[in-house]
Amino acid sequence: GKNYSASIIGIDNNTDIAVLKIITDNKLNSIEIADSENIKVGDRVLAIGNPYGIGISVSNGIISATGRDYGNPYLQLIQTDAAINPGNSGGALINENGNLVGINSKIFSKTGAYQGIGFAIPSNLIVQIVSELIQYGKIRTTWIGNFRVVRIRVNLNNKIVNALKVIEIDNFGPLYEKGVRENDIILEINEEEGTWGNLTKSLRFAGLGNDIQ
C-alpha cells in the first residue's frame, strides 16, 4: 500500500464516518456506489477489512436483513453473516459486482468475536452523511418540537400497516404549529411508512427550514 497525507473535512460521531481530503498529484480511483434500497435479503456480499490487524482480508456472506436499528434508529443498518471482527469496522461491504453497498460498522456478539451477526451502514445513508460533511463540515441537527410517540399497527383499507401515535406534545414548536395534536396517528413520513426509523431518518437529513411531510 501507499501512504498519503490527508486533512479532515468533517466527522460524524454518530456513525463514526469521516471525510478526508487526500493530498496527492496522483489520480485516485473511486469505488462505484450501489443503491442500497435495491439490496435484497439473500444477496451475496463481501466484507473487506483488517481483522485483528493481521492484514487486509475478505469474507463472504449474504444480506441477512435490512432496516436494523440495533439501538440507533437513525442508521437502519444492513445485517450480514459475512465475518466482521474487530478491525473490520470502516471496511467496505460490496456486492458481487464490486460496488459499495455499505460500510462495516459493528457486530452483535456476547464474546466480542464474530458470531454470524454483523452490521453495515447502508450506502445511501453514507452518501447523505458524506454530502453533508463535505458541504458543512458537520452533520446539522433539526428540531420539530418536543413530543412522544408509540409504535402501533392500524388497519388501512384492509391492510395492516405500521404507524406512530402521538401520546404527548408540547404546545409550541413546528410540529404543534402545523396542527399535530395528542392522539394523532402518523401513517406516512415523506411518502414512506410511518415508523420511528423513517421519522428519525427524515429529521436527521431534513435541510434546515425544509418541510417534512
Give the ranges of each region predicted by the language model.
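Conserved catalytic motifs of ABC-family nucleotide-binding domains
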Residues: 183-186
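Serine-dependent protease modules
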Residues: 1-162, 167-172, 176-178, 189, ...
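Short, conserved beta-strand segments of beta-strand-rich sandwich/propeller modules, principally
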Residues: 211-213
